[in-house]
Amino acid sequence: MSKIPPALLSEAIQNVLKDRKERKFKESIDLQVNLKNYDPQKDKRFSGSVRLPHVCRPRMTVCLLCDLVHEDIAKKNDVPTMNQEELKKLNKNKKLVKKMCNQYDAFLCSESIIKTVPRLVGPHMHRVGKFPTVCAQNESLPDKVLELQSTVKFQLKKVLCLGTCVGHVDMTEDQVRQNVVMAINFLVSLLKKNWQNLKSAYIKSTMGKSQRIY
């Protein structure tokens, strides 16, 4: 059960959407959360991902590391690819792997070659949090891309503040609300004492002011 006051959330979302201006890029809406009574040194550091009801990052670029069959499917769906031969050419070269990782926001990988990826590219993808998600050939590739564009991750590191994208300013108030509520409820479920560990929460657009929701 969410403890976010509905009226406060509604007002915050309206303020975020009202403040948007015509820009050359689509502003994202971020959820920013501060925790309390948590010790990152002693308490278990959590990490978890959840798929939100609506696509929050439509501009997220996804590349498929693929076998030859999957390559044809990807081309028909305008999904960028790198096949095994192209991956072999990287030859675990740090600079080249880094360049590939910087070029795309996320990666998918054909089920048939997932086990060879660490051998071909080394540990860098894992290190930067971009190790590919498996995509079986019987799964719809466009759906898998949408899934990545709708999924957010929470990971506690050394500081007690967390943030993630939960939408963009072209969404409706209702779509933003559904995404925010699901994201915050999921985060709370990862916390040791649930809502008791939540100090405050805000939403803000890229260029807008922070709006407190908790």
From Swiss-Prot:
Origin superkingdom: Eukaryota
GO molecular function, one term: RNA binding
Keywords in alphabetical order: Ribonucleoprotein, Ribosomal protein
Pfam family, one: Ribosomal_L1
InterPro entries: eL8/uL1-like, Ribosomal_uL1, Ribosomal_uL1-like, Ribosomal_uL1/biogenesis, Ribosomal_uL1_3-a/b-sand, Ribosomal_uL1_CS
Residue ranges of coiled coil: none
Gene3D superfamilies: 3.30.190.20, 3.40.50.790
One of the GO BP terms on file: translation
Signal peptide: none
Gene Ontology cellular component annotations, sorted alphabetically: cytoplasm; large ribosomal subunit; nucleolus; ribosome
Cystine bridges: none
Keyword Cytoplasm applies: no
PROSITE patterns named among the record's database cross-references: RIBOSOMAL_L1
Family indicated by similarity: Belongs to the universal ribosomal protein uL1 family.
PANTHER family, A to Z: RIBOSOMAL PROTEIN L7AE FAMILY MEMBER
Protein name per UniProt: Large ribosomal subunit protein uL1
Organism: Trypanosoma brucei rhodesiense
